[in-house]
């Protein structure tokens, strides 16, 4: 399937699930990018999960995202249970803005969901000639050595 047709179909799906045009565009772009990078677990394979979470009201399709400036370098974002791509996209843009102004851009995001590959956001900072450290939390999936109960997520931190 051609990229333009796939993007059009994805946008239609997200719009049907009540995302704004801008948010549908953001989500479609990141899903396609994951497929191009052959990160299948973060691409189209996740589409049903996102749609199911919207239907279950776990993801808010019309979030009222709030950015709070803590200082010139630090911002805090309440993503209002947005789809993760949207909260993270706003977050990296804010971090870049802060870093260009002060040399450091630190952004914490709460009430967001699965956001795909961290590299999506890190690449934007690198393209702006900035160093970046981008990470997220993850549910307990791995047990410490010798333990029976999962404690660690599969994220690097």
Regions found by a protein language model. Name each.
Residues 10, 95, 121:
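Aromatic/hydrophobic pocket-lining residues that form π-stacking "cages" and hydrophobic walls in ligand
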Residues 45-96:
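Active-site cofactor/substrate anionic-group-binding motifs, chiefly glycine-
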């Amino acid at each position: 399937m051609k990229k333009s047709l796939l993007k059009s179909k994805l946008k239609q799906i997200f719009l049907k699930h009540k995302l704004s045009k801008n948010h549908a565009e953001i989500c479609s772009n990141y899903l396609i990018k994951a497929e191009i990078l052959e990160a299948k677990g973060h691409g189209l394979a996740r589409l049903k999960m996102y749609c199911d979470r919207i239907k279950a009201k776990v993801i808010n399709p019309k979030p009222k995202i709030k950015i709070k400036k803590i200082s010139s370098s630090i911002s805090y974002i309440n993503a209002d249970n947005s789809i993760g791509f949207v909260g993270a996209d706003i977050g990296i843009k804010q971090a870049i803005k802060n870093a260009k102004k002060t040399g450091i851009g630190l952004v914490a995001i709460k009430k967001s969901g699965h956001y795909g590959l961290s590299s999506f956001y890190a690449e934007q900072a690198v393209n702006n000639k900035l160093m970046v450290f981008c990470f997220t939390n993850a549910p307990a999936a791995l047990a410490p050595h010798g333990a029976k109960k999962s404690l660690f997520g599969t994220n690097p931190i």
